[in-house]
Amino acid sequence: MTTLVVFIQVQGRPGIIETKLGPATTIGELKAALAAVGVNIDVETFIYVEDAENHLHGEHHEPAYGVKHGCRIHVSRCKRIRATVHYLDKTETRDFAPGARIRAVKAHAVDVFHIPPKDAGEHVLQLCNSLERPASDTPLHTLADHNTCAVCFDLVPEKRIEG
């Protein structure tokens, strides 16, 4: 019998939890595995696999679609994360799935703001009113405000070279 190792990230809780699941995990088995590692699931908590647009839902005996070896399971109180990006004098807001990564937000901003590829490669997302620049594989729910399900970024040059 093959076991699947999955990585759990919970909104409002730092770090990553590693756990093992069976090869054909059901929604009920996944919820039981989450409870076993101290992650409480209630009616206001949603489970996402990787960067899926929709949360897992259904009966306990139904398959937990998308669960595979090495995947990330995201547990969030937000169904969507509203990401706002400021670039120069422009602002763009869009809703993303909680498991969406920073790189998806940047890609959307680059497209909307019509930034050439060379310039896009020299810019990063920085949290508004801070100097923090999250890694491109950071899930949005780990940065979002828990009450508003929102996060704000500035698209800034990675390095500023003065001549």
UniProtKB/Swiss-Prot annotation:
Biological process terms in GO annotation: defense response to virus; protein modification by small protein conjugation
Positions of the Ubiquitin-like BIL-type domain: 4-80, 81-163
Sites of the Glycyl lysine isopeptide (Gly-Lys) (interchain with K-? in central tail fiber acceptor protein) crosslink: G163
Intrachain disulfide bonds: none
Keywords: Antiviral defense, Isopeptide bond, Repeat, Ubl conjugation pathway
Coiled-coil residue spans: none
Protein purpose: Component of the Bil (bacterial ISG15-like) antiviral defense system, composed of BilA, BilB, BilC and BilD. The Bil system specifically conjugates a ubiquitin-like moiety (bilA) to the bacteriophage central tail fiber (CTF, or tip attachment protein J) via reactions involving E1 (bilD) and E2 (bilB). Modifies CTF of phage SECphi27 and SECphi4, which probably interferes with assembly of the phage tail. Also modifies T5 baseplate hub protein pb3 (gene D16), but not gp27 of phage T6 (Bil defends against T6). Expression of the Bil system in E.coli (strain MG1655) confers about 100-fold resistance to phage SECphi27, SECphi18, SECphi6, SECphi4 and T5, but not to SECphi17. When cells expressing the Bil system are infected by phage SECphi27 at low multiplicity of infection (0.03 MOI) the culture survives, at 3.0 MOI the culture collapses at the same time as cells without the Bil system.
Name this protein carries in UniProt: Bacterial ISG15-like ubiquitin-like protein BilA
